[in-house]
Amino acid sequence: IISMFLGEQLEDVVMQLIDKGDATSSIQKGKLKTGASTLPDLNKDATDRNRTSPFAFTGNKFEFRMVGSSDSIAPANVVLNTIVAESFKEIADQLDGVENFDMAVHDLIKKLFTDHHRIVFNGNGYSDAWVEEAERRGLPNIKSMVDAIPALTTPKAVKLFESFGVFTEAELKSRAEIKYEAYAKAINIEAKTMIDMAGKQIIPSVISYTTELANSVLTVKEAGADASVQADLLAEVSGYLKDMKAAYTKLIDVTAKAADVTDITEQAKYFRDEVKTTMDELRAPADKLEMIVDKEFWPFPSYGCLLYTSDAADDL
């Protein structure tokens, strides 16, 4: 969901322009009270940074934060610059030859803010409430790369890029095909890596742990003591292990079948709908097991170990 964070100060100015047609005031910076009498109060920004927004105003600039960690920023810059160029052209065309230029600028700014204010959102962009609110506002919710790629070759996009001499229709179609192929290859590599990790490391390790638990149950019972805790844990781990093995087998099957889909667009959709979905099914019990399997048996450092201890390397 694409939204824009303006912050309290700029949002207040925009709302004044929409409601009154003029901005006569703005929210000013406050003081950060440290609570310590020996330290001075500090100036603080009139707004925060909102790290959940994909497109945020941060005091003196806008930040576009949606570029993937492994992607080049060049394609995003090309698209953003082309969009800005089109907007400037439309504005220039509307202002060309007007008698009262200042009033025309004023009215146009008010109209643009009013027409497009639905994209402004200053709240938590990760919340379910925002998903519902975005739907109410009529904003698109594009959930995967495969869903986003067709936007490159829509008649509207082709007209935009061709009118500014950026891309031809053939160039856009070729880029779309390349993106489909890159997506399919990336998910294929991740799926095979997941199969290797689950089959050669996690499942054998959990089997060893369940064996240890089973022996513990027998030993405690032979001693005449209550082994219900060990038995309950054994049942829980065995249940997750069963789910994981089923998803593991399914992932091997659906990944192998992907090679039979020859059309690159359909193959990308197959990886999204079948392979990625099965990967999520495999991860779910693995995440549960990571929380309850003895550290000595788990084959990888846990998130907690990586974040909070210095012996993560020793666990590899």
Show which residues each predicted segment covers.
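Active-site capping/gating regions of soluble enzymes
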Residues: 1-178
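Charged, amphipathic alpha-helical oligomerization/scaffolding segments
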Residues: 83-86, 90, 197, 201-208, ...
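Extended alpha-helical coiled-coil "stalk/arm" regions that scaffold and mediate dimerization/assembly
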Residues: 180-214, 218-221, 229, 261-264, ...
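Long, low-complexity or tandemly repetitive, helically biased scaffold regions used
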Residues: 250-263, 310
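Conserved small/polar residues in nucleotide/adenosyl-binding loops
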Residues: 308-316
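Generic long, charged, amphipathic alpha-helical segments
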Residues: 216-242, 246-247
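Long amphipathic alpha-helical coiled-coil segments
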Residues: 259-271, 293-307
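Flexible loop/turn segments at secondary-structure boundaries
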Residues: 63, 70-74, 204-205, 210-212, ...
